[in-house]
A protein has these predicted regions:
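Outer-membrane beta-barrel porins/channels
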Residues: 1-219
Length: 219
C-alpha cells in the first residue's frame, strides 16, 4: 500500500493494527474490510482541551478640554490550543479478530493575529456618551496532529497487543481566520455621587466571519 496525506495515514494505522485489511494486494487499493465484529460494543471518549488566547495592547489616549476622551489600541494576539482525544472501543463480539481498540488523536493549533480598537467618551455635565469600534481580528493559524493506536488480537493461543505509534507530527498549510468587527455605543447618567444609570448597545455581524481554504485537506 502507498501512504500519502492524512487519509492515507488513517489507513496505515488501521492496517498496521490489524483493524482493517485491503480487499486485494493492489498497492493502489482503496477498499477495505473490517476485522472487528460489531455487536454491543462499548465506546469511551475522553477529551481534554487546554490553551490560551493572549492579547498584548499598545495604548494611546488623549483628552480635549476635559470634555472629549479619545483612545486607540493596537493589539497583537497569540493563540495556543491543544485538543487531546482518546477513543476506546471494547466488548467486541466473541468472533471478532480484533478487540479493545484505543486510538489517540492530538490536535495542536497555534497562530498569531492583529486587531485595532478606537473609542471615545463625550462628557456633558452629568451625561456620558461613548462610542467604540473594534476592527476585525485577523489570524493566521497552523495545525498539527499526532496519532497513535493500539489493539489486541489472538495468534493461536497467544494474546498479542499491537502498539502503533509512528511518532510523526503531521503539519498542514496555514490558514486564515477573520473575526468580524464590532461597534458599541453607550449612554450613562451620573447622579452626582449617589450612583449612575448606564446602557450599552453592541453590534457584530458574525455572518462576516471568514475562514480561508488555503489549508484545505482531507483532515
Amino acid at each position: 500500500m502507498l501512504f500519502r496525506s492524512y487519509g492515507a495515514q488513517q489507513a496505515f494505522l488501521g492496517y498496521q493494527s490489524y483493524i482493517i485489511d485491503p480487499i486485494s494486494n493492489n498497492p493502489y487499493e482503496q477498499s477495505y474490510i473490517s476485522n472487528i465484529e460489531s455487536s454491543q460494543n462499548r465506546h469511551y471518549l475522553n477529551v481534554i482541551n487546554n490553551g490560551f488566547h493572549r492579547k498584548t495592547s499598545f495604548n494611546f489616549s488623549g483628552l480635549y478640554e476635559n470634555i472629549l476622551h479619545l483612545g486607540f489600541n493596537i493589539n497583537q494576539h497569540r493563540i495556543d490550543f491543544i485538543n487531546d482525544q482518546e477513543f476506546f472501543e471494547g466488548e467486541q463480539d466473541l468472533n471478532s479478530l480484533i478487540y479493545d481498540v484505543s486510538f489517540d488523536n492530538k490536535l495542536i493549533s497555534y497562530g498569531e493575529g492583529f486587531s485595532l480598537q478606537f473609542g471615545t467618551i463625550l462628557k456633558l455635565n452629568n451625561i456620558r456618551l461613548g462610542l467604540s469600534y473594534d476592527s476585525p481580528q485577523w489570524f493566521e493559524i497552523n495545525d498539527e496532529t499526532i496519532q497513535k493506536i493500539s489493539s489486541y488480537r489472538y495468534d493461536g493461543e497467544f494474546e498479542i497487543k499491537e502498539n502503533i505509534n509512528p511518532e510523526i507530527t503531521n503539519t498542514y498549510r496555514p490558514y486564515n481566520i477573520k473575526i468580524p468587527s464590532k461597534v458599541s455605543a453607550s449612554f450613562a447618567y451620573v447622579f452626582n455621587e449617589r450612583g449612575l444609570f448606564s446602557i450599552e448597545y453592541s453590534s457584530q455581524n458574525l455572518s462576516n466571519s471568514y475562514l480561508s481554504d488555503n489549508g484545505a485537506s482531507s483532515y
